[in-house]
Protein backbone atom coordinates (compact mmCIF):
# COMPACT_ATOMS: atom_id res chain seq x y z
CA UNK A 1 0.00 0.00 0.00
CA UNK A 2 1.50 3.37 -1.01
CA UNK A 3 1.50 6.47 1.18
CA UNK A 4 -1.47 8.14 -0.55
CA UNK A 5 -3.61 5.01 0.00
CA UNK A 6 -2.64 5.01 3.69
CA UNK A 7 -3.51 8.72 3.96
CA UNK A 8 -6.89 8.15 2.28
CA UNK A 9 -7.69 5.23 4.60
CA UNK A 10 -6.87 7.46 7.57
CA UNK A 11 -9.26 10.11 6.23
CA UNK A 12 -12.06 7.58 5.84
CA UNK A 13 -11.46 6.25 9.35
CA UNK A 14 -11.44 9.78 10.79
CA UNK A 15 -14.74 10.50 9.06
CA UNK A 16 -16.24 7.51 10.88
CA UNK A 17 -14.70 8.47 14.22
CA UNK A 18 -15.52 12.18 14.26
CA UNK A 19 -19.20 12.70 14.93
CA UNK A 20 -20.99 14.03 11.85
CA UNK A 21 -22.79 16.49 14.15
CA UNK A 22 -19.44 18.04 15.09
CA UNK A 23 -18.37 18.25 11.44
CA UNK A 24 -21.63 19.96 10.56
CA UNK A 25 -21.33 22.35 13.49
CA UNK A 26 -18.06 23.72 12.15
CA UNK A 27 -18.83 22.71 8.54
CA UNK A 28 -15.41 21.12 8.20
CA UNK A 29 -15.18 18.22 5.76
CA UNK A 30 -12.06 16.19 4.96
CA UNK A 31 -10.85 16.28 1.36
CA UNK A 32 -10.96 12.97 -0.59
CA UNK A 33 -7.55 11.91 -1.95
CA UNK A 34 -8.48 12.31 -5.63
CA UNK A 35 -9.40 15.96 -5.04
CA UNK A 36 -6.36 16.51 -2.79
CA UNK A 37 -4.13 15.11 -5.53
CA UNK A 38 -5.80 17.28 -8.17
CA UNK A 39 -5.36 20.39 -6.02
CA UNK A 40 -1.68 19.62 -5.39
CA UNK A 41 -1.03 19.21 -9.10
CA UNK A 42 -2.33 22.73 -9.73
CA UNK A 43 0.82 24.10 -8.12
CA UNK A 44 3.65 24.91 -10.50
CA UNK A 45 7.13 23.46 -10.12
CA UNK A 46 9.36 25.23 -7.63
CA UNK A 47 12.86 25.90 -8.87
CA UNK A 48 14.55 26.68 -5.57
CA UNK A 49 16.04 23.86 -3.48
CA UNK A 50 13.99 24.51 -0.34
CA UNK A 51 10.20 24.85 -0.42
CA UNK A 52 7.83 25.75 2.43
CA UNK A 53 4.21 24.55 2.49
CA UNK A 54 1.32 25.56 4.76
CA UNK A 55 -1.83 23.52 5.43
CA UNK A 56 -4.14 25.73 7.53
CA UNK A 57 -7.15 24.04 9.10
CA UNK A 58 -5.37 20.81 8.28
CA UNK A 59 -7.95 18.36 9.63
CA UNK A 60 -6.34 14.92 9.20
CA UNK A 61 -3.51 16.48 7.20
CA UNK A 62 -4.12 14.82 3.85
CA UNK A 63 -3.90 18.04 1.79
CA UNK A 64 -0.54 19.09 3.20
CA UNK A 65 0.78 15.54 3.04
CA UNK A 66 -0.16 14.96 -0.61
CA UNK A 67 1.14 18.41 -1.59
CA UNK A 68 4.46 17.62 0.13
CA UNK A 69 4.71 14.32 -1.75
CA UNK A 70 4.36 16.19 -5.06
CA UNK A 71 7.56 18.12 -4.37
CA UNK A 72 9.40 15.30 -2.61
CA UNK A 73 8.85 13.07 -5.64
CA UNK A 74 9.77 15.75 -8.17
CA UNK A 75 13.50 15.34 -7.54
CA UNK A 76 13.96 19.12 -7.84
CA UNK A 77 13.68 20.09 -4.19
CA UNK A 78 16.36 19.17 -1.66
CA UNK A 79 14.24 20.06 1.34
CA UNK A 80 10.47 20.24 1.86
CA UNK A 81 9.07 21.91 4.98
CA UNK A 82 5.39 21.48 5.90
CA UNK A 83 3.53 23.49 8.55
CA UNK A 84 0.14 22.04 9.57
CA UNK A 85 -2.28 23.95 11.80
CA UNK A 86 -5.32 22.23 13.32
CA UNK A 87 -7.15 23.35 16.48
CA UNK A 88 -9.14 20.12 17.06
CA UNK A 89 -7.10 17.84 19.34
CA UNK A 90 -9.32 14.87 18.35
CA UNK A 91 -7.78 14.96 14.88
CA UNK A 92 -4.15 15.13 15.98
CA UNK A 93 -3.66 11.37 16.01
CA UNK A 94 -4.66 11.13 12.33
CA UNK A 95 -2.69 14.25 11.40
CA UNK A 96 0.48 13.01 13.10
CA UNK A 97 0.03 9.55 11.61
CA UNK A 98 -0.13 10.89 8.05
CA UNK A 99 2.91 13.11 8.59
CA UNK A 100 4.84 10.21 10.13
CA UNK A 101 4.22 8.06 7.04
CA UNK A 102 6.12 10.64 4.97
CA UNK A 103 8.88 11.15 7.55
CA UNK A 104 9.50 7.40 7.58
CA UNK A 105 10.35 7.46 3.87
CA UNK A 106 11.90 10.88 3.23
CA UNK A 107 14.83 12.26 5.22
CA UNK A 108 14.58 15.62 3.43
CA UNK A 109 11.10 16.28 4.83
CA UNK A 110 10.44 18.38 7.92
CA UNK A 111 7.03 18.94 9.52
CA UNK A 112 5.71 21.28 12.22
CA UNK A 113 2.27 20.68 13.72
CA UNK A 114 0.41 23.36 15.69
CA UNK A 115 -2.62 22.34 17.74
CA UNK A 116 -3.78 25.96 17.84
CA UNK A 117 -6.39 28.35 16.48
CA UNK A 118 -5.25 29.36 12.98
CA UNK A 119 -6.08 33.02 13.62
CA UNK A 120 -3.65 33.09 16.55
CA UNK A 121 -0.86 31.39 14.58
CA UNK A 122 -1.50 33.57 11.51
CA UNK A 123 -1.13 36.71 13.62
CA UNK A 124 2.15 35.38 15.00
CA UNK A 125 3.48 34.42 11.55
CA UNK A 126 2.53 37.76 9.99
CA UNK A 127 4.11 39.66 12.88
CA UNK A 128 7.35 37.70 12.46
CA UNK A 129 7.35 38.16 8.68
CA UNK A 130 7.20 34.42 7.95
CA UNK A 131 5.82 33.42 4.54
CA UNK A 132 5.18 30.25 2.54
CA UNK A 133 5.83 29.23 -1.06
CA UNK A 134 2.76 27.02 -1.33
CA UNK A 135 -0.44 27.09 0.73
CA UNK A 136 -3.18 24.49 0.36
CA UNK A 137 -6.45 24.66 2.32
CA UNK A 138 -9.90 23.21 2.78
CA UNK A 139 -11.06 25.55 5.57
CA UNK A 140 -14.19 25.30 7.74
CA UNK A 141 -17.25 26.77 6.01
CA UNK A 142 -19.01 28.03 9.15
CA UNK A 143 -20.01 31.61 9.91
CA UNK A 144 -17.88 33.72 12.25
CA UNK A 145 -18.70 33.12 15.91
CA UNK A 146 -19.96 36.32 17.52
CA UNK A 147 -19.17 34.98 20.99
CA UNK A 148 -15.48 34.12 20.56
CA UNK A 149 -14.08 37.46 21.71
CA UNK A 150 -10.45 36.33 21.40
CA UNK A 151 -10.90 35.43 17.72
CA UNK A 152 -12.80 38.64 17.03
CA UNK A 153 -10.07 40.73 18.65
CA UNK A 154 -7.33 39.05 16.56
CA UNK A 155 -9.32 39.54 13.34
CA UNK A 156 -9.88 43.19 14.21
CA UNK A 157 -6.15 43.74 14.76
CA UNK A 158 -5.41 42.05 11.42
CA UNK A 159 -8.10 44.11 9.65
CA UNK A 160 -9.95 40.99 8.53
CA UNK A 161 -13.70 41.46 8.43
CA UNK A 162 -15.18 38.84 6.13
CA UNK A 163 -18.50 37.18 7.07
CA UNK A 164 -17.31 33.59 7.00
CA UNK A 165 -14.52 31.42 8.37
CA UNK A 166 -13.42 30.17 4.94
CA UNK A 167 -13.03 33.70 3.55
CA UNK A 168 -11.01 34.70 6.64
CA UNK A 169 -8.70 31.74 5.96
CA UNK A 170 -8.28 32.77 2.31
CA UNK A 171 -7.41 36.36 3.22
CA UNK A 172 -4.93 35.41 5.92
CA UNK A 173 -3.34 32.77 3.69
CA UNK A 174 -2.73 34.99 0.69
CA UNK A 175 -1.14 37.49 3.08
CA UNK A 176 1.21 34.68 4.15
CA UNK A 177 2.39 33.94 0.59
CA UNK A 178 5.99 34.54 -0.43
CA UNK A 179 6.76 36.82 -3.41
CA UNK A 180 5.93 34.23 -6.07
CA UNK A 181 3.81 32.11 -3.78
CA UNK A 182 0.69 30.16 -4.77
CA UNK A 183 -2.48 29.34 -2.83
CA UNK A 184 -4.94 26.58 -3.75
CA UNK A 185 -8.21 26.34 -1.83
CA UNK A 186 -11.43 24.36 -2.07
CA UNK A 187 -14.23 26.60 -0.80
CA UNK A 188 -17.91 27.50 -1.36
CA UNK A 189 -18.60 29.64 -4.40
CA UNK A 190 -20.55 32.19 -2.33
CA UNK A 191 -17.64 34.65 -2.13
CA UNK A 192 -17.97 35.35 -5.88
CA UNK A 193 -21.00 37.59 -5.43
CA UNK A 194 -23.19 39.24 -2.80
CA UNK A 195 -22.56 42.49 -0.96
CA UNK A 196 -21.33 40.74 2.21
CA UNK A 197 -18.16 39.70 0.37
CA UNK A 198 -17.56 42.97 -1.53
CA UNK A 199 -14.75 44.20 0.72
CA UNK A 200 -13.17 40.73 0.73
CA UNK A 201 -13.23 40.52 -3.08
CA UNK A 202 -11.79 44.01 -3.54
CA UNK A 203 -8.88 43.29 -1.17
CA UNK A 204 -8.21 39.89 -2.71
CA UNK A 205 -8.21 41.18 -6.29
CA UNK A 206 -5.87 43.99 -5.27
CA UNK A 207 -3.33 41.66 -3.65
CA UNK A 208 -3.36 38.47 -5.74
CA UNK A 209 -4.38 37.20 -9.17
CA UNK A 210 -6.88 34.43 -9.85
CA UNK A 211 -4.95 31.93 -11.96
CA UNK A 212 -7.42 29.05 -11.95
CA UNK A 213 -11.02 28.20 -11.01
CA UNK A 214 -12.59 24.74 -11.13
CA UNK A 215 -16.36 24.77 -10.72
CA UNK A 216 -18.06 21.42 -10.09
CA UNK A 217 -21.21 20.98 -12.18
CA UNK A 218 -23.03 19.10 -9.43
CA UNK A 219 -23.47 20.54 -5.95
CA UNK A 220 -23.62 16.98 -4.59
CA UNK A 221 -20.45 15.39 -5.93
CA UNK A 222 -17.52 16.89 -4.04
CA UNK A 223 -18.34 15.98 -0.44
CA UNK A 224 -21.20 13.58 -1.17
CA UNK A 225 -20.32 11.26 1.70
CA UNK A 226 -21.02 14.16 4.09
CA UNK A 227 -24.29 15.22 2.43
CA UNK A 228 -22.92 18.67 1.50
CA UNK A 229 -24.97 20.48 -1.16
CA UNK A 230 -23.16 23.81 -1.36
CA UNK A 231 -21.70 24.77 -4.71
CA UNK A 232 -17.95 24.38 -4.32
CA UNK A 233 -14.98 25.70 -6.32
CA UNK A 234 -11.27 25.03 -6.33
CA UNK A 235 -9.45 28.34 -6.74
CA UNK A 236 -5.77 29.08 -7.29
CA UNK A 237 -4.42 32.49 -6.28
CA UNK A 238 -0.93 33.69 -7.07
CA UNK A 239 1.33 36.67 -6.52
CA UNK A 240 2.88 36.11 -9.94
CA UNK A 241 1.90 38.28 -12.90
CA UNK A 242 -0.52 36.46 -15.19
CA UNK A 243 -2.54 37.48 -18.24
CA UNK A 244 -5.26 34.84 -18.31
CA UNK A 245 -7.38 32.80 -15.91
CA UNK A 246 -8.09 29.14 -16.63
CA UNK A 247 -11.70 28.11 -15.94
CA UNK A 248 -12.81 24.46 -15.66
CA UNK A 249 -16.45 23.44 -15.21
CA UNK A 250 -16.77 19.70 -14.74
CA UNK A 251 -17.31 16.96 -12.18
CA UNK A 252 -14.24 15.28 -13.66
CA UNK A 253 -10.82 16.19 -12.31
CA UNK A 254 -9.04 16.91 -15.57
CA UNK A 255 -8.34 19.70 -18.05
CA UNK A 256 -10.72 18.49 -20.76
CA UNK A 257 -13.36 21.11 -19.95
CA UNK A 258 -11.04 24.07 -19.42
CA UNK A 259 -10.74 27.35 -21.29
CA UNK A 260 -8.64 30.45 -20.68
CA UNK A 261 -10.11 33.92 -20.27
CA UNK A 262 -8.64 37.38 -19.97
CA UNK A 263 -8.74 38.71 -16.44
CA UNK A 264 -11.10 41.52 -17.49
CA UNK A 265 -13.58 38.85 -18.56
CA UNK A 266 -13.67 37.50 -15.01
CA UNK A 267 -14.08 40.80 -13.15
CA UNK A 268 -15.32 44.10 -14.56
CA UNK A 269 -13.72 47.45 -13.73
CA UNK A 270 -17.00 49.36 -13.48
CA UNK A 271 -18.69 46.80 -11.22
CA UNK A 272 -19.06 48.46 -7.79
CA UNK A 273 -19.35 45.05 -6.11
CA UNK A 274 -16.36 43.44 -7.90
CA UNK A 275 -18.32 40.26 -8.64
CA UNK A 276 -16.24 37.32 -9.88
CA UNK A 277 -17.74 35.82 -13.04
CA UNK A 278 -17.21 32.18 -13.96
CA UNK A 279 -17.86 31.85 -17.71
CA UNK A 280 -18.72 28.35 -18.84
CA UNK A 281 -17.28 28.67 -22.35
CA UNK A 282 -15.89 31.17 -24.82
CA UNK A 283 -19.42 31.69 -26.21
CA UNK A 284 -20.17 33.46 -22.93
CA UNK A 285 -18.10 36.39 -24.17
CA UNK A 286 -20.87 37.25 -26.63
CA UNK A 287 -23.27 37.44 -23.70
CA UNK A 288 -20.92 39.69 -21.75
CA UNK A 289 -20.32 41.95 -24.73
CA UNK A 290 -24.05 42.35 -25.35
CA UNK A 291 -25.10 43.02 -21.79
CA UNK A 292 -22.11 45.15 -20.81
CA UNK A 293 -23.09 47.66 -23.52
CA UNK A 294 -26.34 48.45 -21.69
CA UNK A 295 -26.12 51.89 -20.14
CA UNK A 296 -28.23 51.71 -16.99
CA UNK A 297 -28.60 49.90 -13.69
CA UNK A 298 -31.53 49.50 -11.34
CA UNK A 299 -30.28 52.43 -9.29
CA UNK A 300 -29.80 54.64 -12.37
CA UNK A 301 -33.37 53.85 -13.39
CA UNK A 302 -34.46 55.37 -10.08
CA UNK A 303 -35.67 51.98 -8.85
CA UNK A 304 -34.90 49.94 -5.76
CA UNK A 305 -35.12 46.31 -4.74
CA UNK A 306 -36.07 45.26 -1.22
CA UNK A 307 -36.51 41.99 0.60
CA UNK A 308 -39.93 41.14 2.00
CA UNK A 309 -40.20 42.25 5.61
CA UNK A 310 -42.51 39.56 7.01
CA UNK A 311 -40.54 36.73 8.65
CA UNK A 312 -43.37 34.32 9.30
CA UNK A 313 -41.96 32.30 12.19
CA UNK A 314 -41.25 35.37 14.32
CA UNK A 315 -44.03 37.73 13.19
CA UNK A 316 -46.38 38.36 16.13
CA UNK A 317 -49.09 40.20 14.17
CA UNK A 318 -50.17 37.44 11.79
CA UNK A 319 -53.93 36.93 11.77
CA UNK A 320 -56.70 34.97 10.06
CA UNK A 321 -59.00 38.01 10.30
CA UNK A 322 -59.92 39.18 6.81
CA UNK A 323 -60.53 42.80 7.75
CA UNK A 324 -60.10 45.48 5.10
CA UNK A 325 -57.45 47.28 7.16
CA UNK A 326 -55.26 44.16 7.44
CA UNK A 327 -52.75 43.45 4.67
CA UNK A 328 -52.72 40.23 2.64
CA UNK A 329 -49.31 38.48 2.74
CA UNK A 330 -47.65 37.58 -0.56
CA UNK A 331 -45.74 34.26 -0.35
CA UNK A 332 -43.27 32.68 -2.76
CA UNK A 333 -45.83 30.02 -3.67
CA UNK A 334 -47.99 32.78 -5.12
CA UNK A 335 -45.31 33.47 -7.77
CA UNK A 336 -45.93 31.16 -10.72
CA UNK A 337 -44.47 31.56 -14.25
CA UNK A 338 -44.32 35.36 -14.42
CA UNK A 339 -47.73 35.63 -12.79
CA UNK A 340 -49.13 36.10 -9.31
CA UNK A 341 -51.79 33.59 -8.28
CA UNK A 342 -53.17 34.38 -4.84
CA UNK A 343 -55.44 31.31 -4.87
CA UNK A 344 -52.72 28.65 -4.74
CA UNK A 345 -51.59 29.03 -1.14
CA UNK A 346 -53.63 30.06 1.87
CA UNK A 347 -51.92 29.55 5.24
CA UNK A 348 -53.98 29.59 8.41
CA UNK A 349 -53.04 33.23 9.05
CA UNK A 350 -52.68 34.89 5.63
CA UNK A 351 -52.96 38.50 6.83
CA UNK A 352 -50.88 40.99 8.77
CA UNK A 353 -52.60 43.28 11.26
CA UNK A 354 -52.07 46.94 10.47
CA UNK A 355 -50.68 49.06 13.29
CA UNK A 356 -47.87 51.54 13.89
CA UNK A 357 -45.29 48.71 14.04
CA UNK A 358 -46.40 46.82 10.91
CA UNK A 359 -47.17 49.81 8.66
CA UNK A 360 -43.54 50.01 7.54
CA UNK A 361 -43.73 46.36 6.39
CA UNK A 362 -46.52 47.09 3.91
CA UNK A 363 -46.52 48.25 0.30
CA UNK A 364 -49.27 50.49 -1.12
CA UNK A 365 -51.50 49.43 -4.00
CA UNK A 366 -49.50 49.51 -7.23
CA UNK A 367 -47.48 47.55 -9.81
CA UNK A 368 -44.39 45.66 -8.61
CA UNK A 369 -42.02 42.98 -9.84
CA UNK A 370 -41.76 40.13 -7.35
CA UNK A 371 -38.64 37.92 -7.44
CA UNK A 372 -38.15 34.61 -5.65
CA UNK A 373 -35.03 34.63 -3.50
CA UNK A 374 -34.58 30.85 -3.41
CA UNK A 375 -33.19 29.69 -6.74
CA UNK A 376 -30.99 26.67 -7.43
CA UNK A 377 -28.47 26.25 -10.25
CA UNK A 378 -30.37 23.14 -11.39
CA UNK A 379 -33.52 25.22 -11.96
CA UNK A 380 -34.48 26.03 -15.54
CA UNK A 381 -34.32 29.74 -14.65
CA UNK A 382 -32.27 31.47 -11.95
CA UNK A 383 -34.45 34.60 -11.87
CA UNK A 384 -38.08 33.67 -11.17
CA UNK A 385 -40.43 36.64 -11.30
CA UNK A 386 -44.09 37.53 -11.10
CA UNK A 387 -45.87 40.78 -11.91
CA UNK A 388 -47.93 42.04 -8.98
CA UNK A 389 -50.51 44.41 -10.46
CA UNK A 390 -52.93 46.89 -8.92
CA UNK A 391 -55.74 44.45 -9.69
CA UNK A 392 -54.24 41.93 -7.25
CA UNK A 393 -54.87 44.32 -4.36
CA UNK A 394 -58.29 43.87 -2.77
CA UNK A 395 -57.39 46.53 -0.19
CA UNK A 396 -55.09 49.55 0.06
CA UNK A 397 -51.96 47.63 1.12
CA UNK A 398 -50.24 44.28 0.82
CA UNK A 399 -47.13 42.89 2.49
CA UNK A 400 -44.35 40.62 1.22
CA UNK A 401 -42.89 37.56 2.94
CA UNK A 402 -39.13 37.32 3.51
CA UNK A 403 -38.46 34.68 0.82
CA UNK A 404 -39.27 37.27 -1.86
CA UNK A 405 -37.63 40.43 -3.19
CA UNK A 406 -39.64 43.18 -4.85
CA UNK A 407 -38.73 46.06 -7.18
CA UNK A 408 -40.31 49.43 -6.42
CA UNK A 409 -39.87 53.17 -6.83
CA UNK A 410 -39.59 55.09 -3.55
CA UNK A 411 -41.55 52.30 -1.80
CA UNK A 412 -44.42 52.64 -4.28
CA UNK A 413 -45.45 50.92 -7.49
CA UNK A 414 -44.16 51.42 -11.04
CA UNK A 415 -45.79 52.41 -14.32
CA UNK A 416 -47.40 49.42 -15.97
CA UNK A 417 -45.38 49.66 -19.19
CA UNK A 418 -42.13 49.79 -17.18
CA UNK A 419 -43.18 46.74 -15.17
CA UNK A 420 -43.79 44.68 -18.30
CA UNK A 421 -40.58 45.81 -19.98
CA UNK A 422 -38.38 45.20 -16.94
CA UNK A 423 -40.00 41.82 -16.24
CA UNK A 424 -39.40 40.77 -19.86
CA UNK A 425 -35.74 41.77 -19.60
CA UNK A 426 -35.19 39.85 -16.36
CA UNK A 427 -36.66 36.74 -17.99
CA UNK A 428 -34.43 36.77 -21.07
CA UNK A 429 -32.32 33.65 -21.60
CA UNK A 430 -29.25 35.84 -22.14
CA UNK A 431 -29.79 37.46 -18.72
CA UNK A 432 -30.19 34.04 -17.12
CA UNK A 433 -26.84 32.94 -18.59
CA UNK A 434 -25.20 36.17 -17.47
CA UNK A 435 -26.42 35.73 -13.88
CA UNK A 436 -25.23 32.12 -13.78
CA UNK A 437 -21.68 33.38 -14.42
CA UNK A 438 -21.43 34.92 -10.97
CA UNK A 439 -24.30 33.58 -8.88
CA UNK A 440 -23.67 30.12 -7.49
CA UNK A 441 -25.85 30.66 -4.46
CA UNK A 442 -29.02 28.81 -3.65
CA UNK A 443 -30.69 32.20 -3.83
CA UNK A 444 -30.84 35.37 -5.89
CA UNK A 445 -29.70 38.30 -3.77
CA UNK A 446 -30.90 41.87 -4.16
CA UNK A 447 -27.29 42.78 -5.00
CA UNK A 448 -27.37 40.31 -7.94
CA UNK A 449 -30.19 42.34 -9.48
CA UNK A 450 -28.54 45.66 -8.58
CA UNK A 451 -25.34 44.59 -10.36
CA UNK A 452 -27.14 43.73 -13.61
CA UNK A 453 -26.60 46.17 -16.49
CA UNK A 454 -30.05 47.38 -17.58
CA UNK A 455 -31.58 48.96 -20.70
CA UNK A 456 -32.51 52.62 -20.26
CA UNK A 457 -35.97 53.62 -19.10
CA UNK A 458 -37.19 54.57 -22.59
CA UNK A 459 -36.30 51.15 -24.03
CA UNK A 460 -37.90 49.32 -21.10
CA UNK A 461 -41.13 51.29 -21.44
CA UNK A 462 -41.19 50.90 -25.22
CA UNK A 463 -40.79 47.12 -24.96
CA UNK A 464 -43.38 47.07 -22.18
CA UNK A 465 -45.87 48.88 -24.43
CA UNK A 466 -45.31 46.35 -27.23
CA UNK A 467 -45.86 43.45 -24.83
CA UNK A 468 -49.02 45.02 -23.38
CA UNK A 469 -50.38 45.72 -26.87
CA UNK A 470 -49.08 42.38 -28.20
CA UNK A 471 -47.17 44.11 -30.99
CA UNK A 472 -43.90 42.20 -30.70
CA UNK A 473 -44.94 39.33 -32.98
CA UNK A 474 -42.34 40.14 -35.65
CA UNK A 475 -39.44 40.19 -33.19
CA UNK A 476 -38.10 38.10 -30.36
CA UNK A 477 -38.14 39.90 -27.01
CA UNK A 478 -34.34 39.83 -26.98
CA UNK A 479 -34.19 41.62 -30.32
CA UNK A 480 -36.37 44.40 -28.95
CA UNK A 481 -33.76 45.08 -26.27
CA UNK A 482 -30.54 44.62 -28.23
CA UNK A 483 -31.30 45.45 -31.89
CA UNK A 484 -31.60 49.22 -31.94
Regions found by a protein language model. Name each.
Residues 47-49, 74-79, 105-109, 127-130, ...:
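Short helix-terminating capping/connector loops at secondary-structure junctions
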Residues 24-25, 29-38, 58-65, 79, ...:
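Signature of N6-adenine DNA methyltransferases within the class I
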Residues 52, 81-83, 112, 184:
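A structural signal for isolated positions on well-ordered beta-strands in alpha/beta enzyme cores
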Residues 51, 133, 368:
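Conserved acidic residues
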Residues 102-108, 203-207:
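Short, conserved catalytic or adaptor-binding loops enriched in Gly and charged residues
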Residues 107-118:
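Conserved SAM-binding strand-loop segment of SAM-dependent methyltransferases
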Residues 286-483:
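Polybasic, glycine- and aromatic-enriched phosphate-binding surface used to engage nucleic acids
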Residues 1-76, 83-101, 122, 139, ...:
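Class I S-adenosyl-L-methionine
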